[in-house]
């Protein structure tokens, strides 16, 4: 036991690119006395329980940045007048058309919308698995949910944070020169988003976790569960003409994902470095197909009660994603 004040001190406050409301600091532990918590040599295992929760939370941080950037840039694009539409004036009562009528502004906005709304479903689904793990009385159901959650965690963390960097930059671009000026707030979103692909495990670490541990190390248990669910959905909707434009491509993508996994595994058996070389691209592919599945489910869930405008918006965004 320490007899006086333990020798722990704050050395300095870090001057960071973003998240400046978080007082990140240098801590000095020279001469401090530490206390063992739990069993010796088991600290890393204990830490990962916390880390996996934190990784999903950082994915949600990225998702929140996407949503706020989208809402701001959408409102700006509706108000900002510049040029006329290439197909003719859309607001002849105004000196120019709002920039939202221009095709590439729509692309920037739709990219944000697609990630924000598809990403929310991905996050809900991941947390559903966490609830099943914590609360289900069925051991087999808990095991399946745990494998799914482990598989999805690096996708949630890496995909939604990389998307946050892309989407906050898109939002700033919609603002043009105003986006580069601090008073409009957009540059802060760009700065704050940058850390999300770094802390709680970089995108590269998430990719190695997905491909190296969850796919190669665990015989792709989580992927097999997920692809089984995708296959069941495609089979159930195979006769639904309204979903044909999504179901056929989704089924093809699921087959390609399975084939890609086999090919990477075979290459890794000959050269282990292939895992590191392929990991990030494999994660991106996995993320895009995962969100394609959830967008198909969003369209399948639409009904008359949602209203015509809402349904049209969801359908247009799903088509953009595909």
Task: Describe the role of every protein-language-model region.
Residues 1-256:
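Internal glycine-rich alpha/beta core junctions
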Residues 217, 233-322:
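C-terminal amphipathic alpha-helical interaction region
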